[in-house]
Design a protein with these regions (language model features):
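N-terminus-centric sequence/structural signature that marks the extreme N-terminus
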Residues: 1-149
């Protein structure tokens, strides 16, 4: 199972994200990454399941507006990908992560109601400076949030 971590509302701190990622090393041996943008930082440890070679995270949309750190599996991602391609969305990977990200870019938070699967995620909108956190409706993939002074 992958691991995601991050912060919002702090000064940019890549070293903090690297330490967070080090603490969740057991969550994924297949890669790690961080994204720092203003008051938001996302970290990801990867356990490759789908598109082993190209699903590195955090992942950005092609226009750079959104970044995602995601853990889970959306079982209907191929159907969603087809819908999104019909709407003009293009893809550079075969990963469900990119489908989830493109779905959010297309439909906003309404995208989550279209997902059949288990997931926890953080999506940073660079234009709106807004962090969206979401998890599957049953909480199969937990998502913990802490508010600290």
């Amino acid at each position: 199972m992958c691991g995601i971590a991050g912060y919002h509302g702090l000064p940019a701190d890549p070293a903090l994200l690297e330490r967070m990622n080090a603490h969740q090393q057991h969550r994924g041996p297949d890669g790690d990454g961080i994204c720092v943008d203003g008051p938001c930082g996302l970290a990801h440890r990867r356990l490759s399941i789908i598109d082993i070679a190209h699903g590195q995270q955090p992942m950005d949309t092609a226009d750079g507006r959104y970044a995602i750190a995601y853990n889970g599996e959306v079982y209907n991602y191929l159907d969603l990908r087809g819908e999104l391609e019909a709407l003009g969305r293009t893809f550079t990977t075969d990963s469900d992560t990119e489908v989830v990200l493109q779905a959010f870019a297309q439909w906003g938070a309404d995208a989550f109601d279209r997902f059949n699967g288990m997931f926890g995620l953080a999506i940073w909108d660079r234009h709106e400076q807004r962090l969206t956190l979401a998890r599957d409706h049953f909480g199969i993939k937990p998502l913990y949030v802490a508010m600290v002074p």
